[in-house]
Amino acid sequence: MIDKIQDKKEISKKLKERAIFEGFAVAGIASISGSSRIKLRTNALERWLSNNYHAEMKWMESEKRKNIGLLFEDAKSVLSVGFTYINSQNNNNNFLKVAKFSQGEDYHKVIHKKLKNIGKWINLEIPDCKWKICVDTSPLLEKAWAEEAGIGWIGKNSNLISKKNGSWF
């Protein structure tokens, strides 16, 4: 395992570079110890749930959503990535309008494959490192962790926004 601080910084740098190599537009790493920002986002979720704004979506109540340690025991950090969904396919249909993110292959599959490639790379670089893939179907505050990782901020529209890509990821 990596013991020296400089080694941790180096592997973090290489990991983000690997994510960019795999086709992600942005990548950042957040420490699980979190910050006041994660606590604020978790508190906001708890208020939202207590007001029953989630209605029938009982899956939103998962404790794993509030405590990443329940999702992946012994986790130390989160790699957050952003994948742009602007593509060359144009919706020239003037009758039907289709959301950009839904044009093309299912992004869950595309992103999962790219993250799995990063996982294989991790296995080679840090053999004793455990990892788990979460693509926005896991009980994880993914936007809050991405914000904590520094790849963007959560805007008034509740989307994650980056300086480079806006909210197109």
Residues of each region from the PLM?
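Auxiliary alpha/beta "docking" domains used to position bulky ligands
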Residues: 1-169
